[in-house]
Amino acid sequence: LSHMGIAADQYMRAPNMLLGVAEVLQDAFNCESGDEPLQPWLALCGGNVGPWDDIGALSINVQETLSPTYALGVMWEPNDWFSWGASYTSEADMNMKGTFEIQYTDDWSGFWQSVNGSVLGAITSAILSLPSGAPKESGNVSMDLVYPQHFQTGISVDVHPKLTLNADIGWTDYKQWDAFVFRFDRNLEFLNAARILSPDNATPNTLRLPLGFKSQWNWAFGMEFHASSRLDLRAGVEIRDSVIPDDQRQVMAPFGGANLYSIGMGYQWDKNTEIDMNLSYLHSVESIPADTSCNLNCDNITNIIYNPYAGLDVKTSLRVVMAGLSFRTKF
């Protein structure tokens, strides 16, 4: 039984060609002067908008209180120097529920309020269900998520009374994460606009974030030096290939291929008590040329759901340091 939650606080922008056109028109109308040359027929100067301007901040928090899974394992030790083991953890189907809030910027709200206050803008907005300029939207949200199943197997060989070598291979079914689909309890203004350009990923009350993850096998190798009858020293590396295809890379999950390096130690405090400590380090660097990932930097007019760096080269760097301490005793 486990608890699962997802939370995010994310500024949003929509570097789309249509917002670029809106910015050019605002410059042509000389909006900084405060004049609206085409009023009352068309008004575009209620707020400064553009492809690189924030349109608001999204806060979302969903969780599943109780999620059952099961695990199976087997160990085979034909002699005192060799052992083989395998384990399997089942997937978990979760219906996560929570709340959301979108706080729009004053410029974004003001722009749409001015558009809707003009004759042509009001007609167009009524036909296409464009945003009205609400400053904030909030409510309840839910999503179905499958926590992927995992299989791992490995061997351990005592090559010397002082030295043990280990090799493992593991598989995780990340192909289950083809997309995250959020269902809102009301129609949202931003989604009403997004559905026109991206009907496959947006409806008035649902948002689909494409992921396209793939299942992956990862190798791991380790060694254990038996320094004394009480102290064991450990080191290892896990070779992690990326589960994210090149055309789906993104900044919300900047996990490229990387190696996870670990060191640790185990100490036998007494015959019933063991203490284990470990320290791990991972560094992932991704260089993503412009127009190669439509979750990040495509320049198509239909890429409006999440495409924050349209037409730009992007480089991501992720460093992770993990420390662990465990205490086990028999009684």
Task: For every predicted segment, state its role.
Residues L1-F331:
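Outer-membrane beta-barrel porins/channels
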